UniProtKB/Swiss-Prot annotation:
This is 4-hydroxy-tetrahydrodipicolinate reductase. Pathway: Amino-acid biosynthesis; L-lysine biosynthesis via DAP pathway; (S)-tetrahydrodipicolinate from L-aspartate: step 4/4. GO terms for molecular function: 4-hydroxy-tetrahydrodipicolinate reductase; NAD binding; NADP binding; oxidoreductase activity, acting on CH or CH2 groups, NAD or NADP as acceptor. The active site is at 132 (proton donor/acceptor), 136 (proton donor).
Length: 277
């Protein structure tokens, strides 16, 4: 049985891409394409709504869909922690609906953010540089904001990043104590560098989106999750098996033991680590 989809913001770059993916899929059917001239009521009757509008419009779209019992996939930037918390208060445990908020549909970008989250515990000097096309209105990007927030959470007892000279405008906008620098220019799809400075070293975790096709796998994954979502789910990382725990659980349930390392008669991993250059 196919799931019917209404795309709000269908004439934008992401709206067009999602519409194409839905139309090419056998799992989903595009039944409504809305732009700024259409009434939100035109989305009613679809199984799920996809919001890819503008930050100033997105909240109203989501509230309307939720009020009419529709699950929503949000691909619009600008959903701050406060706005998400308010949405959670409104619907969690009260309405049988789900809202899936995805700051970035790229699996590679999600992995880069996960790596940055791991590294944040080991460095006290951290900054983010993100770049998007000149037409992107909001800054910092939703991906940069989420990356900064996740790194701040991961730091735990290390506390906030103590970035120097943040009173100067050229030092970027602080998000969860981490300076974020935004570039908006022609020729760029999406790029983010998370830069860590340590004693005598610099670590850069970089992700560069070269074409919109990078979002396709994440969009399909998010659409599938939106069908059955309840409450508020934020981030593609919540939908993919980052640590392999779901795969291991599935193997255990099926009675399939995961294969262990092959003993080739050589030195153990510990010995090899000690003796290798």
């Amino acid at each position: 049985m196919t799931t019917t989809v209404a795309v709000v913001g269908a004439t934008g770059r992401m709206g067009q891409l999602i519409s194409q993916i839905v139309e090419a899929s056998t799992e989903f059917e595009l039944v409504a394409s809305l732009d700024s001239k259409d009434e939100l009521s035109d989305m009613l009757g679809a199984d799920i709504a996809v919001d890819v509008t503008l930050p100033a419009v997105s909240q109203g779209v989501v509230e309307y869909a939720v009020a009419h019992g529709m699950n929503v996939l949000v691909g619009t930037s600008g959903w701050t922690g406060e706005r998400i918390t308010e949405l959670e208060r409104r619907i969690t445990g009260k309405l049988a609906v789900g809202v899936v908020i995805i700051p970035n549909f790229s699996v590679g970008s999600v992995l880069a953010t996960s790596f940055a989250q791991m590294a944040a515990r080991f460095y006290d000097s951290i900054e983010i540089v993100e770049a998007h096309g000149a037409s992107k209105i909001d800054s910092p990007s939703g991906t940069a904001v989420r990356t900064a927030e996740l790194m701040s959470q991961a730091r735990g007892a290390r506390g906030p990043v103590q970035a120097p000279h943040t009173d100067q405008r050229a030092r970027g906008q602080q998000v969860a104590s981490i300076p974020v620098h935004s570039l908006r220019m022609q020729g760029v799809v999406a790029k983010q560098d998370v830069v860590f400075g340590g004693n005598g070293e610099v670590l850069t975790i970089s992700h560069d989106t070269l074409a919109p096709s990078a979002y396709e796998a994440g969009i399909l994954l998010a659409l599938r999750a939106t069908r059955t979502a309840r409450g508020v789910v934020v981030g593609l990382d919540r939908l993919i098996d980052l640590d392999g725990s779901r795969e291991r659980a599935a193997q255990a349930a099926a009675g399939d033991a995961p294969s262990g390392p092959v003993d080739d008669g050589g030195p153990s991993g510990q010995a090899a680590t000690v003796t290798s250059a």
